[in-house]
Amino acid sequence: MSLTDYRQAFEIVKRNILAGNSYLANLTCKVPVSTNLTLEDVFRYSKALYRLWLKDKLVCFSPEIFVRIEDGEIKSFPMKGTIDATLPNAEKLLMDDSKETAEHATIVDLIRNDLSMVAEQVRVVRYRYCDRLETNKGPIFQTSSEICGVLPDDYPSHIGDIIFRLLPAGSITGAPKSKTMDIIEEAENYERGFYTGINGLL
């Protein structure tokens, strides 16, 4: 993507935010990558907590859980806010940053609302705690929250419906989700496909 094309996409998002149509949008673009590594090499090289390799098809990795369902509860752990952990006072800088705080509050509210579509008694169990993650370029601090809700008794026979109702993930779209998805579609002008999707284990 050229800088001109990126600026055009960015301006679409900016215009909509200034108009009040969205207050958080995750703008992405395709980036060509040339490497002599195989998909398996990339998979094995990644230090991400969650990763998937489908032979000759794709590789993906993420530090973030979309949802965890067990014992009648659904949990989500949205992440927003990152800083280089080697910086002096990095954790304090991250926790005191007003932009990062605002973005995190927005995504927590969005995920809480999303979980309320499929669960009762939705609550924020832990708000804005800091995790240290190891990456190939060094350690980072990332802020997360834990949100939990109680699923109906018959949830095991409706797992697919629950997951599809929550998609796409709020952390890779924005808020309000529906309108922001329209803005993203106009700005990005490409299909994300598997990118920013989810995978899981039953």
Question: Positions of the model-derived regions?
Answer:
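Extended alpha-helical targeting/anchoring segments
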Residues: 1-202
